[in-house]
Each structure stands twice: as C-alpha cells, then as structure tokens.
C-alpha cells in the first residue's frame, strides 16, 4: 500500500501482507511506460510480461518512492513458498529486467523464457533455473544457491555469485567475460566463455568442474 508524508506526498510503498501478483491470460504489456514496477510479496508469472524496463521486487518490504531503496520488514499472514515463479508458459521480454527477491529463504523458480538487453537478478533465497534466459548485454545473478538445468546466456559479460553452491546441469555461456563466485561449484555439462572465464570458490572441498 502507498504511504504519504505529512504534506500528503508519496513517501513509500509498504508490502507486508501475503498477496501474490498473478500474470495470466494475455499477459501484461508495459511498453507504453518507461518503467514497469511490480511490488508484491510474491509473483506468479503464467504469461508474458513486455516492457522497456521491468522491475519485479518481492518480499515483505518498504520501498522508498523516491530512491527505490528496498528495506525488509516483518511480513504478515502466510509466508509464500516461492518469491518469483516464472512458469513454462510465462516469460519476460524487456530492454532491462531487474528481479529482486528480498525475503530470506524464498526461492526464485524460472521455467519460462526471459529475454533482455540487460538483466539483474538478486535473491535472498535459492535460484532454480530450468528455462531459457538470455541477455544481449550484461547479466548479473546472485542467489543463495544456484541450480541450472536450462540455458543461461549473455551476449556480453556474465557474473554469477552464490553464497553457497552453484550446480550446472546444462548450459551457462557468455560471449564476453564470465566471472563465477561460490562456496562450491559443480559442473555436469557446459560452462563456456568466448573471452575470460574466472571461477572462484571458497570451500576447501573438491569442486567438480
């Protein structure tokens, strides 16, 4: 809900209930706006979202209306099981895409397609990626654990960072540089870069590359 200061100016947006935004049917076309911003406890995407710049911010949060700063708060009601759930028939198509999961422990699950010029994904829970995600420019992804059984590709640079493990069972690729940082990396299929490839692990356990 929107909150206002004592001069009745929009101050911030407070998301503390258990509501979920559901995108279904013919999807959501935000191309007439410069920026499409979705603030919700959780998002379920069963159809396509189109836009120029798309922000999806989930979790129990207060979002500053002027700066966009996201501050986690205590949520009410039933805690969702998934922060952002992109179904098989769901997808996002935009110049710039920002997917922010700010509630600890909630995963992002991507089974559909995401196409962008520039993409940022930052989640406080795990990322389960079984779909196809492609960025024409830079792609930056951070999550607790990352499990890829789909295709993640960047036509420029890619940065993958996990607080725990990165497990790849299909394809992760970039035309530009790729930097991977995790406690442990397990690769069963293809991790490839046409330029520099850097893999940094912090665990003393053996990594399977």
Predicted features along the sequence, with ranges:
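Extracellular and secretory-pathway beta-repeat/beta-biased strand scaffolds
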Residues: 1-209
């Amino acid at each position: 809900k929107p909150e206002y200061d004592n001069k009745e100016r929009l101050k911030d947006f407070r998301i503390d209930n258990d509501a979920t935004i559901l995108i279904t049917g013919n999807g959501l076309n935000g191309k007439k706006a410069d920026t499409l911003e979705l603030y919700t406890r959780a998002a379920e995407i069963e159809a396509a979202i189109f836009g120029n710049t798309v922000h999806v911010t989930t979790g129990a949060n207060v979002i500053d209306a002027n700066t966009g700063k996201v501050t986690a708060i205590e949520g009410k009601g039933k805690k969702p099981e998934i922060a952002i759930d992109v179904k098989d028939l769901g997808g996002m198509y935009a110049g710039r895409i920002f997917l922010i999961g700010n509630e600890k422990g909630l995963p992002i699950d991507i089974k559909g397609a995401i196409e962008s010029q520039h993409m940022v994904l930052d989640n406080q829970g795990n990322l389960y990626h079984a779909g196809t995600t492609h960025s024409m420019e830079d792609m930056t992804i951070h999550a607790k654990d990352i499990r890829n059984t789909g295709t993640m590709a960047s036509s420029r640079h890619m940065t993958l960072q996990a607080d725990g493990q990165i497990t790849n069972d299909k394809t992760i690729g970039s035309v530009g540089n790729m930097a991977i940082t995790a406690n442990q990396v397990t690769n069963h299929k293809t991790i490839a870069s046409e330029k520099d490839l850097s893999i940094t692990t912090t665990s003393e356990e053996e990594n399977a590359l």
